[in-house]
Structures are given as C-alpha cells and as structure tokens.
C-alpha cells in the first residue's frame, strides 16, 4: 500500500477505522522480535543513509481484517534522539482506509519502560 494520502487517517477516532491498541502492540512485538533475529527483508532508506545500505527491516503482516507494514522510524527526530531502533512506525489498512501510528518505549510517568502507541496512551492494551 502506498504511504501517500495517509496523513490524517490516523486521527479518525472511530474505533472501527483503526486497529485497537493491543493489536498494534502485537504487531510491534512481532516486528521487533523478527528484526532482532534478522528474519526480515531489509531496505535502503533514502534519508540518513549516504552509503545507500539496506539496513532497515520491514515487516508485512495481517491481523484480520487489517493489513500492516512496520518499520523503525527513520526520521531526523528519531536520529537526533538515538531512538531509531526503538520507535516503530506501523502503517495499517482495512477496506481502503489507511493510517499510521508510532509505537515507542515510554520514558516517564506511570508507563515508563512500557511500549505505548503514541497519542493513544490512555487506552488500555
């Protein structure tokens, strides 16, 4: 699925239009486990990769009725904070509706050290 045109879809609050937090955290767990074991295909990101090396693992998976693509965040902010190997961006699609979210390790508060879906911290997994 194309990443274009996804902006804004992740902010739609109707639950049927976005995966629940527990599903997203399960995709995050699968991605980080397979990435750590070297079981995923890698791609060469365009940004912050002057040598054009294929180092970024990519997961394509499904949890009916959702299709997911997960990869580590390769943004300037993630690079600056040293969280490239922690922040996981998950793209999702269902019935033509697309969106994305970011899963991170919470650094403070009652959920410090836990994986959370950024922007949906108040939702129980």
What are these regions (language model features)?
Residues 1-7:
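Helix-hairpin-helix
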Residues 8-125:
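Structure-specific DNA junction-binding interface
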């Amino acid at each position: 699925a194309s990443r274009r045109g996804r902006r804004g879809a992740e902010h739609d609050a109707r639950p049927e239009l976005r995966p629940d937090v527990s599903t997203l955290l399960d995709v995050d767990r699968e991605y980080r486990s397979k990435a750590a074991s070297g079981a995923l295909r890698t791609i060469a990101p365009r940004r912050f990769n002057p040598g054009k090396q294929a180092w970024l693992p990519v997961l394509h998976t499904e949890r009916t009725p959702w299709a997911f693509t997960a990869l580590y965040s390769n943004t300037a902010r993630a690079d600056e904070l040293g969280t490239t190997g922690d922040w996981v961006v998950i793209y999702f699609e269902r019935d033509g509706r697309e969106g994305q979210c970011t899963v991170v390790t919470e650094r403070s508060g009652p959920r410090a050290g836990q994986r959370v879906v950024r922007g949906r911290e108040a939702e129980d997994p």
